[in-house]
Design a protein with these regions (language model features):
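Helical hydrophobic small-molecule/effector-binding pocket
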Residues: 66, 88-124, 171, 205-209
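Short, Lys/Arg-enriched anionic-surface-contact patches
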Residues: 8-14
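C-terminal peripheral helix-coil segments that are non-catalytic and often amphipathic
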Residues: 1-5, 93, 97, 139, ...
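Amphipathic alpha-helical linker/stalk segments
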Residues: 65-94, 102, 144
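Hydrophobic/aromatic residues within well-ordered alpha-helical segments
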Residues: 14, 57, 64, 68, ...
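Short helix-capping/turn signature of helix-turn-helix
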Residues: 31, 54, 115-121, 132-133
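Helix-turn-helix
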Residues: 17, 21, 25-59, 63-67
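Amphipathic alpha-helical packing segments from all-alpha helical-bundle domains
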Residues: 104-109, 113, 123-150, 160-164
Length: 219
């Protein structure tokens, strides 16, 4: 089971260290603290290396966002048959990771900064968050949904609609409330489990039915 991971960024360990420093600078000092000079000092690397790896400052921001999004995992079990239990585990893992990332200081800082920039240039940071963050997560999750449908474990007409139903069940209004200063959940695992239960009640296929569908499809 390996839903499409082509959109997942592949950073070297050293690049990951640099991105962690960039995230720390953003959380501790805000937008103005995140400069290529400041990041080079904090990460003990040259500005030339930063430009080589990430390009300009927008490239650093895009890499930071993609790095954060990569922490929301789906499946990575090459060659393993997708079963109802494995699908459930992968959905729960996705839900837990999503909640943990959204509730983190980095995500909240990035989103608040993007909101604060909405009146300037259409919020360049907001566009980066959508393209390198949310869409990356969406594509990987929808690949898992499609894998579940091919295995006759999920039933839906539109993967995008099914995924956004699941996303809404996981996140609800929690992200907005956290952006407004409320604390995150004490138990992300339980929230993810409840969301998966509700999603499978809507789109899951009972085991007997799934077996019959696989037989009829010759799988």
């Amino acid at each position: 089971v390996r839903p499409d991971t082509a959109d997942t960024p592949q950073f070297s360990p050293r690049q990951n260290e640099v991105l962690e420093q960039a995230l720390r600078l953003l959380v501790e000092g805000g937008d103005k603290a995140l400069t290529t000079s400041g990041l080079a000092r904090a990460a003990s690397c040259s500005k030339e290396s930063l430009y080589k790896w990430f390009g300009d400052r927008d490239g650093v921001l895009a890499a930071m966002i993609a790095y954060q999004a990569s922490k929301v995992r789906t499946a990575d079990r090459a060659g393993e048959k997708l079963t109802d239990q494995i699908l459930k585990q992968n959905l729960e893992q996705f839900g837990r990771d999503l909640l943990e990332v959204l509730a983190g200081d980095v995500s909240l800082a990035l989103n608040r900064l993007a909101i604060g920039q909405t009146s300037r240039d259409g919020s360049k940071l907001g566009k980066l968050l959508v393209e390198h963050g949310r869409r990356q997560i969406d594509r990987r999750a929808m690949a898992l949904m499609e894998a579940g449908k091919r295995a006759s474990l999920l039933r839906f007409e539109n993967a995008d609609a099914a995924y956004h139903t699941f996303y809404g069940l996981v996140v609800s209004d929690l992200h907005i409330r956290m952006l407004l200063g409320e604390p995150g959940l004490k138990d992300n695992s339980r929230q993810a489990e409840r969301a998966v239960e509700a999603f499978l009640a809507l789109h899951g296929v009972e085991q007997k039915t799934a077996d019959a569908l696989r037989v009829s499809a010759g799988r």
